[in-house]
A protein has these predicted regions:
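P-loop NTPase switch module centered on the Walker A-proximal segment
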Residues: 1-105, 109-111, 149, 218-221
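Conserved short loop/turn motifs at secondary-structure junctions
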Residues: 14, 133-140, 177, 181-185, ...
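Residue-level signature of catalytic and energy-coupling elements of molecular machines
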Residues: 20, 26, 59, 80, ...
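Short glycine-/polar-rich loops that comprise or flank the Walker A/P-loop
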Residues: 74, 98-101, 125-129, 163-166
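Amphipathic helical hotspot of TIR/SEFIR-family domains
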Residues: 110-126, 147-150
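Canonical P-loop GTPase G-domain recognition
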Residues: 128, 138-198
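Accessory interaction regions appended to the cores of large information-processing enzymes
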Residues: 165-167, 194-198, 202, 228-264, ...
């Protein structure tokens, strides 16, 4: 493998794009056309950068990935960024490793709020962008309008004149072609490679100084343990070299580097020596944390810690206490759940976990509902069982005043739904900032809304727009609290009054009371929520009742039982649906919704105490 690297031929670049604007496909094509793939393996899996099952399913990138491409003697390190503000912790770290950003924007949609979030961070780091207008071949593409939108966005984000003088490349990643004009695309991606080489500066580093690097990502491997990934700030590193590790508190310890791993395509390979400016992985240093500095034993200097946005949403993770606990999951105890959460903390820097006075409950805080639901979904797939409460926003005391988080929301809906959506957002204390009709029957709305107004809104929004609306949000700022309750659920729920098998006959009778959430012949337990009541109060119902068979020849004997299809919630929908006195029970097999207090008597008693305390 190559040992020497000409620093002037090295380029480090991060890719920024909104969900579904074609970032992952673009990287796939760059890897193929640079010939990097032929050397590692024959055929290429679609979406090679998304390595986690959840990422492939949802089409979102959660964890940042690294890959390297060799093109005409140049070596280009490409780091993928999560496009979603909920993963702000990941974004910060990626930007500390690169010298420029590649902003991929859809030729029809234009820049979206999640792109805005990452771009803002990139400008704050002083990085200069290269803009790729992707999907220029799609019907309705309007590349010139998109370029204007991008320019306006950059001006709004306070870009410098240098940053505003950005090169534009037009591309169709799916077909693997790019060009400097959208009417004239080259045969392949060469114009994009040339733009990267020409406009991205090589890393400004000192090759002869003592070694220093900061860990900005962690990986784990059963054979070598913790792997630290980062960009070498100065100097060079070899396997077996003794180093000093400085953690966030400034404590130092000695260590010896195991392997030094470089990236090529999606593979890692061992190097004999790595130089400043390159992005590498090193093993053999035991427990590492993000932001640790690794340096030469004779020049112990810590690099400034990486800052991460504070969490804005918190929820409780509890041990599953339902009557069906332990039937479907492998890990069910509080110790196992806490161990898993602590393991997550190692690389998920925007997460916080606090123990509570109740040993079976942990307070977990993150950057948003998506951030936390991805963690819950991952735990569920690994065989964990747990119950989670409704998300609540985190208030802050700023200058003696209590403040709450606000989000910037972009909504894209058909004109016929505009009125009802605006009314619903008004009730949730949203303020309109902008309104852009696209002239083709759709409208884009920009809002600033308190984060608590968004909790539970997505499901309602999808129903309101019959699934045709798009809703994107990203954290904006903290500000004074808006008075009044926001976003309470309008409907009550149907609650099972006993444990057993739900029978079709009983469910048939309950259909007129509301929408059911379970199929016939499913096991339910007392206190489980089996449907949505059509009125605003909760109703405890019997869904185990069979048909009485005494009057065999009664006239109603042959009425066929027809059950409507039940409402099935995904994990996110369930978390958004529940109220403060309810929990979502999450197991590897099922997602159930239940009341915190399972018996009707307990609920009535709790209700009485809350009413009496509120009247006194």
């Amino acid at each position: 493998m190559k040992n020497e690297i000409d620093i002037n031929k090295l380029r480090n670049i991060a890719i920024i794009a909104h969900v579904d604007h074609g970032k992952t496909t673009l990287v796939d094509k760059l890897l193929q056309q640079s010939g990097t793939f032929e050397s590692t393996r024959g055929d290429v899996d679609e979406r090679v950068m998304d390595s986690n099952d959840l990422e492939k399913e949802r089409g979102i990138t959660i964890l940042a990935k690294n890959t390297a491409i060799n093109w005409n003697d140049y070596r280009i390190n490409i780091v993928d960024t999560p496009g979603h503000a909920d993963f702000g912790g990941e974004v910060e770290r990626v930007l500390s490793m690169v010298d420029s950003v590649l902003l991929v924007v859809d030729a029809f949609d234009g820049p979206m709020p999640q792109t805005r979030f990452v771009t803002q961070k990139a400008f704050a780091h002083g990085l200069k962008p290269i803009v790729v207008i992707n999907k220029v071949d799609r019907p309705g593409a309007r590349p010139d309008w998109v370029v204007d939108q991008v320019f306006d966005l950059f001006v709004n984000l306070g870009a410098t004149d240098e940053q505003l003088d950005f090169p534009i490349i037009y591309a169709s990643a799916l077909n693997g072609v790019a060009g400097l004009e959208h009417e004239e695309l080259a045969e392949d991606m060469t114009p994009l490679f040339e733009a990267i080489v020409k406009h991205v500066e090589p890393p400004k580093v000192e090759l002869d100084a003592p070694f220093q690097m900061q860990i900005s990502q962690l990986d784990y491997n059963n054979y070598v343990g913790v792997i630290g990934i980062g960009r070498i700030k100065r100097g060079s590193i070899k396997p077996n070299q003794p180093v000093t590790i400085i953690n966030g508190e400034g404590k130092t310890r000695q260590g010896r580097v195991g392997q030094v791993l470089g990236h090529l395509g999606l593979q890692r390979y061992e190097e004999d020596i790595a130089y400043a400016g390159d992005i590498i992985a090193i093993t053999g240093l035991g427990e590492l944390n993000i932001s640790d500095t690794i340096c030469d034993i004779n020049a112990v200097e810590a690099l400034p810690s990486l800052t991460v946005d504070e969490p804005t949403v918190t929820m409780f993770f509890c041990v599953n206490t339902s009557p069906f606990a332990g039937q479907e999951g492998k890990y069910v105890t509080s110790r196992q759940i806490l161990e898993r959460l602590n393991k997550e903390l190692v690389h998920n820097v925007a997460l916080r976990v606090d123990e509570t006075p109740n040993p079976d409950e942990f307070r977990v805080s993150g950057r948003g509902e998506l951030h936390l639901s991805v963690l819950i979904e991952n735990m569920r797939r690994e065989g964990y069982e747990l119950a989670v409460s409704r998300p609540k926003v985190i208030y802050r005391e700023i200058d003696g005043k209590k403040q709450e988080p606000y989000e910037q929301v972009t909504i894209d809906v058909e004109e016929q739904h505009q009125g009802s959506v605006m009314e619903a957002l008004g009730i949730r204390k949203g303020e309109v900032r902008d309104m852009l009709p696209d002239g083709k029957g759709r409208v884009r709305l920009e809002y600033i809304i308190p984060s608590r107004g968004l909790i539970g809104f997505r499901g309602e929004f999808m129903t309101m727009t019959s699934g045709t609306g798009l809703l994107y949000s990203s954290f904006s700022h903290y500000d004074e609290i808006k008075g009044g309750e926001i976003g309470q659920r309008k409907n009550g729920v149907l609650i099972s009054n006993a444990t057993g098998k739900a029978l079709g006959y009983a469910l048939f009778g309950l259909q007129e009371r509301g929408k059911l959430m379970i199929d016939a012949n499913v096991e339910v337990y007392e206190g489980q929520i089996i449907g949505i009541h059509s009125r605003s109060n909760d109703l405890t119902v019997n869904c185990l009742q069979g048909k009485k068979l005494t009057n065999m020849r009664a006239s109603g004997k042959d009425d066929a039982i027809v059950l409507t299809t039940p409402v099935k919630f995904s994990l996110e929908q369930a978390i958004e649906f529940i109220d403060d006195d309810e929990l979502v029970e999450v197991t590897p097999e099922s997602i159930r919704i239940r009341k915190k207090l399972l018996t009707e008597n307990d609920r009535k008693r709790a209700n009485r105490t809350t009413t009496s305390t509120s009247t006194h």
